[in-house]
Structure formats: C-alpha cells, structure tokens
C-alpha cells in the first residue's frame, strides 16, 4: 500500500524506447517486473511517476479515460492463457465483441472475424462453433484473433506460450512472427524463454528487480552470457551448445549464433578451414 511500511516499488528508473515496427523481447527472472511493465503499455496499469508515451499519446498517473480508450485500441495485449477471456456463445461473436464495442458495424466486424480466423490458422467453419468446444490451442488462437480484431498498431505478448507443449509453443510463436511481418506490427514479447527471444527479437530488454539491467540487440545481450546467468537467466540452447563447442575445439572469435542451421554452417566452415578440404554440413 502506497505510503505505508508495506509499500513495494515494482518498477524504478525504467527508461527505454521501442522502435516502431520492431520485435522487442522483454526478459527477466520471475518477479523481475517484466509483466508489470507490460501492463503499463496500454494503460491497464498507470505509472505512479513518469510517463509512458505511445507516439503522440501519453499515459500518466492522472490520465483522462478518453485517451486511455484510444491507447487500448492501439495497443493489443495478449495475456497468459488468453483463452480464459473467451465468453461469447460463438467464435464469431467473441471476435466481433471488441470492434463493435468501439463502434465498428456488425457487417464489418463479421468480415474482419472471418479474415482473422484464417490469419490465425483456423477455418471459417469455426465461426458459428462455441469457443468452449475447441481444443486449448484452438481457443487460444480465437482469443488472439479477438485482440487482432481491434487492429492494434502494437501487439504485447505476455508469456503467450504458457501451458503449451513444445510443438504448440513453436506453432504459436511462428504464427506471431508471421503476423508481425504481414501486419507490420510493433511486437513486444514478454518471456522467460531465451530461445524465443534469441530467435525472433531485434531488441532485447533485460529486467531485474524492477530495473532495466541491460538492453541491446540479441548479439549484444547474449554475448554477456555470464551476466545473464548471474541474473538467474539461461542462455539459449544453441548458445549453450556453441560454448561447449568453443571449449572442446578451442575456437576463438565465434559470433553469437541463434539457430542450429547457423551453428551447422559455422562449424562446417571451421572444419573446412582446418582440414583444407570441402566439408558437408553437419
């Protein structure tokens, strides 16, 4: 409680810029403040001090509701387990709810719902189905379509793969990256999954105890592996393997590599140089 002995500052001295059109990952240990930070992006939480700026719009402690409504249209927030937010009788009604609440006509909202269902990888035959008759993964895609129906400029993903098996995680993240590219969205991924951050992000923000511990592109951040480990974070599996290979074979000046394909290419070239003969990928 503010002003009491039990007051706890969740975020302090946090300052950074997310470029328009970028894919930014916010990573941090449990309790680092990353999810609290994400909820400030669309005014779900307001700062007790300071300002959150979205283009020409601002969120402050005393921000008036009309501006917040516009901000919440521009910034779509996908929570953990977004399927828990489904409530309508049909998939179509659920996707249409947000746009119609903002004044979009029913006909236009229905057209948008059909297009978005395809975009998230579901057939339009699901439009009249109850969302509660679908599988967990399908329900999550419907919930995501509902967020996209607001046509946000910024998409904030708070641990969007929580509760999914590895294959489901891969499919959902590939879908988000495709949407990021096709819709030219500014995408913010809040995650503890270092492999997803390394694979998709242009920029990475590392949170620790409510502060920004480091920022930079993925090459810069993951080159500081020892510091990440000290913050209670892992490095991506590919980089872990790369560190083992460097130690085993005495390699130097190895750039950060973020996929098995990049690692295979690099090792093939290294072996070719060492042996002086062509070498196929391994």
Curated annotation (Swiss-Prot):
Give the first-level EC class, as a single word. Answer: translocase
Q: Where in the cell is it found?
A: Cell membrane
Instruction: Report the GO molecular function annotations.
Output: ATP binding; ATP hydrolysis activity; ATPase-coupled transmembrane transporter activity
One GO CC term of this entry? ATP-binding cassette (ABC) transporter complex
Which amino acid positions bind ATP, per UniProt? 28-35
Pfam annotation, one family? ABC_tran
The ABC transporter domain covers which part of the protein? 1-234
Print the keywords alphabetically: ATP-binding, Cell membrane, Membrane, Nucleotide-binding, Translocase, Transport
User: What's this protein's function?
Assistant: ATP-binding (A) component of a common energy-coupling factor (ECF) ABC-transporter complex. Unlike classic ABC transporters this ECF transporter provides the energy necessary to transport a number of different substrates.
Subunit-level organization = Forms a stable energy-coupling factor (ECF) transporter complex composed of 2 membrane-embedded substrate-binding proteins (S component), 2 ATP-binding proteins (A component) and 2 transmembrane proteins (T component).
Q: What family name appears in the similarity comment?
A: Belongs to the ABC transporter superfamily. Energy-coupling factor EcfA family.
- State the protein's name: Energy-coupling factor transporter ATP-binding protein EcfA2
Q: Which organism is it from?
A: Halalkalibacterium halodurans (strain ATCC BAA-125 / DSM 18197 / FERM 7344 / JCM 9153 / C-125)
């Amino acid at each position: 409680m503010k002003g009491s002995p039990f007051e706890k500052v969740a975020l302090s001295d946090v300052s950074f810029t997310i470029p328009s059109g970028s894919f930014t990952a916010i990573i941090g240990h449990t309790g680092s403040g990353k999810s609290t930070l994400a909820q400030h992006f669309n005014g779900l939480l307001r700062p007790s001090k300071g300002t959150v700026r979205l283009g020409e719009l601002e969120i402050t402690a005393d921000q008036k509701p009309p501006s917040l409504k516009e901000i919440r249209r521009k910034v779509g927030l996908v929570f953990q387990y977004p399927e828990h937010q489904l409530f309508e009788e049909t998939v179509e009604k659920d996707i249409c709810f947000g746009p119609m609440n903002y004044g979009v006509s029913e006909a236009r909202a229905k057209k948008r719902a059909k297009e978005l269902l395809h975009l998230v990888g579901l057939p339009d035959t699901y439009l009249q189905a109850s969302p509660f008759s679908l599988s967990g993964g399908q329900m999550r895609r419907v919930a995501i379509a509902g967020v996209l129906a607001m046509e946000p400029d910024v998409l904030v993903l708070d641990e969007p793969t929580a509760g999914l098996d590895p294959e489901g995680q891969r499919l959902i993240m590939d879908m988000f990256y495709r949407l990021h590219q096709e819709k030219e969205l500014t995408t913010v991924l809040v995650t503890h999954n270092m492999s997803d951050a390394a694979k998709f992000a242009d920029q990475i923000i590392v949170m620790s105890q409510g502060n920004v511990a480091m920022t930079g592109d993925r090459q810069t951040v993951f080159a500081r592996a020892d510091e990440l480990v000290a913050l209670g974070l892992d490095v991506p599996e590919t980089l872990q393997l790369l560190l083992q290979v460097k130690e085993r074979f005495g390699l130097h000046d190895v750039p950060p590599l973020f996929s098995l394909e990049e690692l295979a290419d690099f090792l093939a070239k290294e072996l070719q140089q060492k042996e002086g003969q062509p070498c196929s990928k391994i």
